[in-house]
UniProtKB/Swiss-Prot annotation:
Residues 12-70 form a coiled coil. The gene is pan1. SMART domains: AAA (SM00382). ATPase which is responsible for recognizing, binding, unfolding and translocation of substrate proteins into the archaeal 20S proteasome core particle. Is essential for opening the gate of the 20S proteasome via an interaction with its C-terminus, thereby allowing substrate entry and access to the site of proteolysis. Thus, the C-termini of the proteasomal ATPase function like a 'key in a lock' to induce gate opening and therefore regulate proteolysis. This is Proteasome-activating nucleotidase 1. Gene3D superfamilies: 1.10.8.60, Nucleic acid-binding proteins (2.40.50.140), P-loop containing nucleotide triphosphate hydrolases (3.40.50.300). Keywords: ATP-binding, Chaperone, Coiled coil, Cytoplasm, Nucleotide-binding, Proteasome. One of its GO terms (molecular function) is ATP hydrolysis activity.
Length: 406
């Protein structure tokens, strides 16, 4: 029921003056306008909330409708004829002749993967079968590492560039000389000497796709999984030629074969045989270069070391004094280092240390400066970092010995 004028409570007394009544009415009008504006804002918020829930309802309804649809089956096109397409279902291997729309026929070819419904009609074409794990190994953006970031490995880096980079940038040079470019390079040496760093640097200097994986990722529990992943890996490389395939810790799948009858060892050997087949099988590898790295060269099977698979066997040793000095300068070029720091003396005092150890010393020296509330790294910080690195390595060595004789 609508209030009448008599029902409305006035904001003033009847005895009030005309001026007081006018001021009271103006004050009430201002209050009502504020309340009206607030209610309008709340209405807009409510409408926005309603639209959001309406969109969510439509999305859930669409998803619910999709979930109620019958699943599609996977099949492979065996042959295209005038009557349609001959397909073979995955799983039961049953073959069938089915109709194909003109739009799909234009893109299909023998070997294409398709999705079919209950009546075996081709609904859509699927991507080529390649293991998802192999696809995620591809690195689209080249690693942000340059040759100037590597110190003490000039000879090794030159050989790697001749094997990987030169055939991609100037293939005509090899044709003129009349030789085939080396197809693979194996980097071996102690941990932390820069094997992976060299592979990243070469990839960053070429326009090739860089595909990196660890050998341990190829070791799987079920029969045939590792070999299938190797095939898929090289198929991805062929699809993205030119390509550089980097296999780290290759000793995980290429160790010396034994007479062991366990299923795990047999699966590893099957994976290695597939790798050998891909490296020098009947199918040409095309413009694909392989870089592998290991710190257990003594464990590798002789079959994988012969020429034609890895044409370059490059040892990556600990850097010498000059190499360590260059590595010190590389890792400190962005640091605020005091003028009194003698990198030549530091290099001479850090014998038999790897490039990774030198980097750890530089980082730890910076931490010592921060601990003393300084922004400048001094010679004493590097010396203290070296002592700390020696102390940290001694318990680890003792633990390894105790585990060996436990």
């Amino acid at each position: 029921m609508t209030d009448t004028v008599e029902d409305v409570e006035l904001p003033y007394d009847d005895s009030a003056s005309q001026q007081d009544k006018l001021e009271a009415l103006e004050e009430q009008l201002s209050t009502l306008e504020e309340e009206n504006e607030e209610m309008r804002d709340r209405l807009l918020d409510a409408n926005a909330e309603n639209n959001k829930y309406q969109q969510k309802l439509e999305r859930l309804s669409h998803e619910n409708k999709k979930l109620k649809q019958s699943p599609l089956f996977i099949a492979t096109v065996q042959e295209l004829t005038d009557e349609g397409a001959v397909i073979k279902q995955h799983g039961n291997n049953q073959e069938a002749l089915t109709e194909v729309t003109d739009e799909l026929r234009a893109t299909l070819e023998p070997g294409s993967r398709v999705a079919v419904n209950n009546s075996l009609s081709v609904v859509r074409q699927l991507d080529d079968e390649a293991d998802v794990r192999a696809r995620v190994m591809e690195v689209d953006d080249s690693p942000d590492v340059g040759y100037e970031d590597i110190g003490g490995l000039d000879d090794q880096l030159r050989e790697v560039r001749e094997t990987v980079e030169l055939p991609m940038k100037d293939p005509g040079l090899f044709e003129t000389v009349g030789i085939n470019p080396p197809s693979g390079v194996l980097l071996h040496g102690p941990p932390g000497t820069g094997k992976t760093l060299m592979a990243k640097a070469v990839a960053s200097q070429t326009d090739a796709s860089f595909i990196k994986m660890a050998g341990s990722e190829l070791v799987h529990k079920f029969i045939g999984e590792g070999a299938k992943l190797v095939r898929d890996l090289f198929q991805v490389a062929r699809d993205h030629e030119p390509a550089v395939v980097f296999i780290d810790e290759i000793d995980a799948i290429a160790s010396k074969r034994t007479d062991s009858k366990t299923s795990g060892d047999a699966e590893v050997q099957r994976t290695m045989m597939q790798l050998l087949s891909e490296m020098d099988g009947f199918d040409e590898r095309g413009d694909i270069r392989i870089i592998a790295a290991t710190n257990r060269f003594d464990m590798l099977d002789r079959a994988i070391l012969r020429p034609g698979r890895f044409d370059r066997l490059i040892e990556v040793p600990h850097p010498n004094v000059g190499g360590r000095e260059k590595i010190f300068r590389i890792h400190t070029r962005a640091m605020n280092v005091a003028d009194s720091v003698d990198f030549g003396e530091l290099a001479a005092d850090t014998g038999d240390l790897s490039g990774a150890d030198v980097k750890a010393i530089c980082t730890e020296a910076g931490m010592f400066a921060i601990r003393d509330d300084r922004t400048e790294v001094r010679m004493q910080d590097f010396q203290s970092a070296r002592e700390k690195l020696d102390q940290d390595s001694e318990p680890a060595a003792a633990t390894d010995v105790s585990r060996t004789f436990a």
